[in-house]
Amino acid sequence: SFANLGDVIIAEPGALMGFAPLRVVQEATGKPLPKGAHTAESHMEHGMIDQIVDRTDLREMISVLIHLLHQPPQQAKKKRRGRVKRPTIKGFKRGPAWELVQLARHRERPSATTYISLLTESFVELHGDRFFGDDASIVGGVGDINEQAVMLIGQERSRNGAQTYPEGFRKAQRLMKLAANLGLPIITLIDTPGAYPGLDAEERGSGNVIASTLALASDLPVPMISVIIGE
């Protein structure tokens, strides 16, 4: 249980994990255990760990994480004064409002994972809400931009129909809290038609978790930049 207090939890493929021994679990339930119970893969599916990493790759993964999560505080730079010029895009002409809406919904527009891969020099995706599952429509993790470690949280439209489940909001909350504890700026990439409206989501507290996510984001002790990359 103590290992579950880690900021980032990594397991080797096929590793046995869990609180109670398999025999005790089976005796308590009186039912045969599902295949793969108490394995790293099962815990990953249910949002309990961040990564499954082969032993041969552990050294590189851990070294990248240490580099990203334990950067020395940057010295304060001399404040720059002046106005930021509004960027201009060559070949772009502002058209009717509906054309802009269609452009924002273009099927070939870059996704959150595309932006993350282009923005960061190194990036480690973190998985799971530590409660129920891992919503793939929310992609998040720590990366570095121009030698500055940041927490990136994006809505990935190519997964789960781009609709966010309660587990996705809880994962976002977890990453926000981790960023706050480590003093990392947060960048969010927004692109979604809305939260998943199914009954199962309601039963897992979608209304509550959306409200608490907004409350948390509005009271963070670190800077947060939100970038709208779609709808």
Question: Would you name each region that the model predicts?
Answer:
Residues P21, P34, H38, D54, ...:
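Alpha-helix initiation/capping motif
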Residues T29-P32, L118-F123, D129-F132, P166-E167, ...:
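A short linear-motif detector with a strong N-terminal bias
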Residues S1, G141-S218, M224-V227:
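Cleft-lining beta-strand/loop regions that shape enzyme active-site pockets
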Residues S1-Q74, I190-E231:
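Conserved catalytic cores of soluble enzyme domains
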Residues R59-V150, G154-G161:
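Intrinsically disordered, low-complexity segments enriched in small/flexible residues
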Residues G18-F19, G36-A37, T113, T120-F123, ...:
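Aromatic-residue hotspot detector
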Residues N4, H38, P110-T114, I138, ...:
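Charged, alpha-helix-enriched surfaces in structured cytosolic catalytic cores
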Residues D7, P87-K90, L184:
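A generic hydrophobic-helix recognition signal that picks specific residues
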